[in-house]
């Protein structure tokens, strides 16, 4: 269990993020077109998992915008933006913002992604949503970098994630 904060108030996650050097757990997540994708859909590409509570918050929206901008410069890399939002909300946001360099995926059906990755919030006002995390995977799905953002209203360390991607 990781202890994080929401505006200074302590909250907890269901477990810890996967360890660097381990194989990332597979997942089944829903696209904005209501297709189902798994990690194997991205095999052979480096992957950035940008995970957040809801696309409808300012910090979460900014993380998607920032990674969308960075993704346009990245070779052989997919940026997956993952939340418990309905796929329709994710699609609406990216459509309105003109964001085309990231893939939005939803864990709305059963939360199994959050459970497998240890990042479900288990108490406090955001209970049941994902905590803010970034995980970088190499082309074989091996975890190369993780960040569990300590204060949920803060943005992730984009620079560190992008540097880890260079080494993946």
What are these regions (language model features)?
Residues 1-168:
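Chalcogenol-based redox active-site neighborhoods
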């Amino acid at each position: 269990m990781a202890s994080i904060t929401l505006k200074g108030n302590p909250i907890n996650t269901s477990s810890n993020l996967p360890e660097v050097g381990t194989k990332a757990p597979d997942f089944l997540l829903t696209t904005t077109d209501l297709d189902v994708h798994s990690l194997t859909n991205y095999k052979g590409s480096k992957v950035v998992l940008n995970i957040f509570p809801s696309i409808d918050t300012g910090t979460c929206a900014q993380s998607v915008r920032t990674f969308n901008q960075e993704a346009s410069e990245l070779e052989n890399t997919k940026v997956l933006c993952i939340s418990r939002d309905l796929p329709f909300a994710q699609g609406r946001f990216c459509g309105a913002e003109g964001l085309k360099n990231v893939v939005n995926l939803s864990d709305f059906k059963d939360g199994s992604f959050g459970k497998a990755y240890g990042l479900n919030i288990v108490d406090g006002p955001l209970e049941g949503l994902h905590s803010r995390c970034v995980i970088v995977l190499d082309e074989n799905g091996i975890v190369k970098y993780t960040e569990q953002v300590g204060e949920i209203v803060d943005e992730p360390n984009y620079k560190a994630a992008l540097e880890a991607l260079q080494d993946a």
